[in-house]
Amino acid sequence: MTNPRTPILIGVGQVTEKDPPIDEASSPLDLIEQATVLALKDAGISRENLSDLTTLVVVKSFREPMRNTPEALASRINATKAAQWLAPDGGNGPQYLVNRYSEAIFSGEEDFVLLSGAEAMATGRKIVKSGNKPPWSVDSDKDADLLFADRQMWNDHELKHGIWQASHVYPLFENALRAHYGNSLPDHQIMMGELFSRLSEVAESSPHAWYPVKRSPEEIATATPSNRFVGWPYTKFMNAMNQINQSASLLLTSIEKAEEMGVDPNRWVFLHGASDVTDVWNVSYRENFYSSPSMKIMGENALNMAGLEINDIRHLSLIHISEPTRQAEISYAVFCLKK
């Protein structure tokens, strides 16, 4: 018999809003609410069920639009009884939250959890260019509670030498990888172009891709006025986009709570393996720039927990980090529809 405290993912929602008129554009809070409504629909439950949330977590935006986004969201969706947290931004953040709260649900510390986040920098930039400020703030008498400390990514030595942004650091990694592989500069550039060309092929058919355009390896690898170097050797077409209007929400709960809410078992997605690791935090202290032993350990742990090998994985999602974060904490998970 399956443990009734087994954590399951019951609903997800994703929203992409491209180039809306300024007076009709959604705020980040609007986008999160829309994604949450879609997650409810995906789970087959009603908005009233959100009053049962025990915790909601919002992943911090690059530029937080208000003093206390989790509180504003809780008020908007009538989940004021839930614990409300703001999680620092970072490429591993969403998956870390799934791993953390799945464990908390299994232990009985949590029962029903909403994980959300949004960016509306595309609209925000358009509003600023018009000479105005985004009217997105919601009054609060307190700052949002951070789920964990927002740790600085660089030390004084790195800052002194201009190594503190992702566009400063990832080129060091890439050139170390190139040297490790024994590639020439032109060969490595086209190799990166070939990789991102395959990714652009996936984006071409995705309704949520900000640029659903298939590009050739040469188009991606070659710097042009419309494809400038962002941080050599990376061109614009190799970089993640931060000036977007997108959001996502995810609902986690236990089997017994899902049954209480009447969620169809066909909607249950089980977490079969998970792992979180922290690399050597400051890059200047790392043994080299071309390998990450922690990534290897993380992948092995999650796959071993699931009883699978990498060739058994049908869908693999790798997070592409954009400014201002860079990868030091890494999370991994294996999901399956089967128990």
Question: What is the predicted function of each stretch?
Answer:
Residues P28-I45, T69, S254, S291-A306:
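Short, well-ordered amphipathic alpha-helical segments that serve as non-catalytic structural scaffolds
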Residues N49-V59, Q84-P88, L114-A118, H188-E194, ...:
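Beta-strand segments within the central parallel beta-sheet cores of soluble alpha/beta enzyme folds
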Residues I319-K339:
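Single conserved hydrophobic/aromatic residue that forms the stacking wall/gate
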Residues K60-K126, G131-W154, K160-S167, A221-G231, ...:
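Conserved catalytic cysteine-centered active-site region
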Residues D89-E119, G162-S205, S249-K257, N304-L308, ...:
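Active-site-proximal alpha-helical scaffold in enzymes
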